[in-house]
Amino acid sequence: MKLSLASIGRLLAQLGLTCQKPLFRAYQQNPTLVEAWLQTEYPKIRAQAKRVGAEIFFEDESGVRSDFHSGTTWAPKGQTPIVRVTGARFSLNMISAISPRGTLRFMVVRGGVGAQVFITFLKRLLAGMDHPIFLIVDGHPAHRAKSVQRFMESLEGRLKIFFLPPYSPELNPDELVWNDVKNRGVARAIVNGPRDLLRAVVGRLRYLQKTPNMVQSFFHAPETRYAAAM
C-alpha cells in the first residue's frame, strides 16, 4: 500500500499529532542528574540561601556575530525585502547573571572568556552587594579553574558557586537573556561595524537591567520555573 504525503499528514492529524519545531537536547544529558537537580539539589540550595541571607544568581556566557540575522520585515507582496548589511565578520562575547528578583549584571568583552575574565566579572557582580551570592553556573572550564577556586576562597563566604547538571542549558534562565539580546537587540539593528554591534548588545542589556519584570519572566519558562522567586 502506498500513501501520498497529504494522506500521511491527514492520518497523523487524526492521531492528534501536529507538525512542530522540536526542542533539541544533548544525548549526553543524564535524566537522573536533571531530576536530582530539580527535586533535591536546587531546593537545598534555595533553603541554604534563605538561611544565610544569600541571593541566588544564574550565570552564563554567549557570543554574537555580525552575521546574526533573524526576524521579519514588511515589503510589497511578492517582493522579498533586502536589508543591506556589512559583509565583514566580527563578534563580541557576553557574560551575564540574573536573579529571580529580576536583577541583571553583565559584562561585554572582545576576545575569549577565560578564568581571569570570569574573575573580573565576579568582582563586578559582588560590587555593592551587602549579602552573600550563590552563583549557579554550567561546566565551562573557566568556572572550574583553580584560580577561580582560590578567588572564591579569599572572599570568606561572600560567594559560593554551584554547578548545573552537564548538558542542561535549558535549566539556566540566563540562557533566555541571550535569546532576547540576539533576537530583540542585534537582529533589529543595522550592524555596519563593531561599534554598531556593541551598541546593539549593550543597549538591549541595559534595557533589560531597567525592566526587572522582563528578567523575572525568564524564570517562568516551562524549563526554568523551578527557579522562580517564591
Regions found by a protein language model. Give the residues of each.
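Short functional hotspots at interaction and active-site rims
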Residues: M1-M230
